[in-house]
Amino acid sequence: MQSLHGNCLIAYARHKYILTMVNGEYRYFNGGDLVFADASQIRVDKCVENFVLVSRDTLSLFLPMLKEEALNLHAHKKISSLLVHHCSRDIPVFQEVAQLSQNKNLRYAEMLRKRALIFALLSVFLEDEHFIPLLLNVLQPNMRTRVCTVINNNIAHEWTLARIASELLMSPSLLKKKLREEETSYSQLLTECRMQRALQLIVIHGFSIKRVAVSCGYHSVSYFIYVFRNYYGMTPTEYQERSAQGLPNRDSAASIVAQGNFYGTNRSAEGIRL
């Protein structure tokens, strides 16, 4: 398999297992070892049932679930390209994830299950101090992703350019400049994040319009409706009615989830123990 930059690989050794690095080095693992690695540094040419390739898009979804200190990108002279966690018992879901990963025509429910199971596997490494540096080194998130991560960690907060810049350990002027280089702004990203969350709360969770407005940081329901109508071309109530009738909307909830904007109401990410 060709090495892919921006992707990661999770391998599970049920028995003794060998991975070959792109530099020709061999890494040996014992049964029960779960491996997280930079896919661009690994050669995988057999035993596909032993690994799961995690795309950049999926990694970008996992990033906002981490605590905010994970966003502080410090320079690391040397970052390991591979981490190992020895599991004391078998991981029955790994085979399912591997099978789902080989299927190119997943149903919507299967897509969500695959993503959830991958997140569970990634969470095994959360207590490893080298995990976040490796994840960020592979992903190298742009400023848009980092700003959206801050916003989505507390969607209802009264965010300002200065506050977001403070969270990212930079000056407001520098943040504004970097966002301009990516042809966006903090206010545009704030609206995007809030509108995407609003859609999920309305269509998926069935929240009332007033509750959605408050949950997304709007003190005025009428202003929330105004922003929603400008963004989606219809009011929240009209969107609810069309969704209930199965009519197509400009941006369906399913497509927003599929494109990587699905966040639960609980923002914490607790690692599972194996």
UniProtKB/Swiss-Prot annotation:
A UniProt-annotated Pfam family: HTH_18
Cellular compartments per GO CC: cytosol
Induction of the gene: Expression can be activated by RpoS and repressed by CRP, H-NS and GadW, depending on the conditions.
GO molecular function: DNA-binding transcription factor activity; transcription cis-regulatory region binding
Record keywords: Activator, DNA-binding, Repressor, Transcription, Transcription regulation
Domain HTH araC/xylS-type: residue ranges: 145-242
Regions recorded as binding DNA: 162-183, 209-232
Subunit structure: Homodimer.
Record function comment: Positively regulates the expression of about fifteen genes involved in acid resistance such as gadA, gadB and gadC. Depending on the conditions (growth phase and medium), can repress gadW.
NCBIfam families listed in its UniProt record: PRK09978.1
Protein name: HTH-type transcriptional regulator GadX
The encoding gene: gadX
